[in-house]
C-alpha cells in the first residue's frame, strides 16, 4: 500500500466514531498492551481501561495517555465495558472468568458483552468458560494473535 493510501486510510479511521463505548484489557503484557495501543491509535473505543497485577504498568500506561483508567482489581474498572480482551496466562483465565461472571451478576456488565482471549491454547479456556457460565457465552471469541520478538511486557508493545 502506498504511503498516500495508508495516510488516507489512517485519517478515515481516526475520524469515524468509536466502535466501542469502553474496552477493558485484562493483562498489559506484550499482547495486551499491543491491543490497547492499536485500539487507542485507531480511536476504536471512547474509553480504554486495563487491569494488571503489575501496578507500574498501569501507572505508566495512564501517564502516557494510553489508558483512561486502570487497576490491579478488575471490579474497579470493568463496569460498562462492551469489549473485554483477556491477555493473561492460560492458568489465570479461570480466576478472570470468576470476576467477569461476578460483574455480570452484579449488573456491571451486560451478559452479551464481547469477550475475547488472546491466550495460547483454547481447550482450557473453553472448558473454564463452560464451567463458569454454564455454557459457552455467545459473546466469547477465542483467539490467539501472533505477536512479539525477543522482548516482553508493556514496553515491548508496538
Predicted features and spans:
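Ligand/cofactor pocket segment of small-molecule handling proteins
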Residues: 155-158
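Rossmann-like NAD(P)-binding element
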Residues: 74-114
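Rossmann-like NAD(P)(H) cofactor-binding subdomain of soluble oxidoreductases
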Residues: 99-152
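Short beta->alpha hinge that forms the Motif I/post-I loop of the SAM-binding pocket
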Residues: 53-54, 88, 118
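Conserved short alpha-helix immediately C-terminal to the canonical SAM/SAH-binding motif I
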Residues: 57, 92, 122-125
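NAD(P)+-binding Rossmann beta1-loop-alpha1 motif at the extreme N-terminus of oxidoreductases
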Residues: 2-79
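Short secondary-structure boundary/capping elements
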Residues: 53, 69, 92, 150-151
Amino acid at each position: 500500500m502506498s504511503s498516500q493510501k495508508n495516510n488516507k486510510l489512517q485519517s478515515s479511521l481516526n475520524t469515524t466514531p468509536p466502535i466501542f463505548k469502553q474496552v477493558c484489557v485484562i493483562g498489559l503484557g506484550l499482547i495486551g498492551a499491543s491491543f490497547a495501543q492499536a485500539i487507542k491509535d485507531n480511536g476504536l473505543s471512547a474509553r480504554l481501561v486495563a487491569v494488571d497485577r503489575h501496578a507500574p504498568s498501569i501507572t505508566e500506561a495512564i501517564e502516557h495517555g494510553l489508558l483512561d483508567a486502570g487497576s490491579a482489581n478488575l471490579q474497579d474498572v470493568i463496569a460498562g465495558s462492551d469489549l473485554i480482551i483477556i491477555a493473561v496466562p492460560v492458568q489465570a483465565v479461570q480466576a478472570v472468568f470468576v470476576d467477569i461472571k461476578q460483574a455480570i451478576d452484579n449488573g456491571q456488565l451486560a451478559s452479551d458483552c464481547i469477550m475475547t482471549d488472546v491466550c495460547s491454547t483454547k481447550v482450557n479456556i473453553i472448558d473454564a468458560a463452560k464451567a463458569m457460565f454454564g455454557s459457552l457465552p455467545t459473546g466469547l471469541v477465542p483467539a490467539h494473535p501472533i505477536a512479539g520478538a525477543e522482548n516482553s511486557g508493556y514496553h515491548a508493545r508496538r
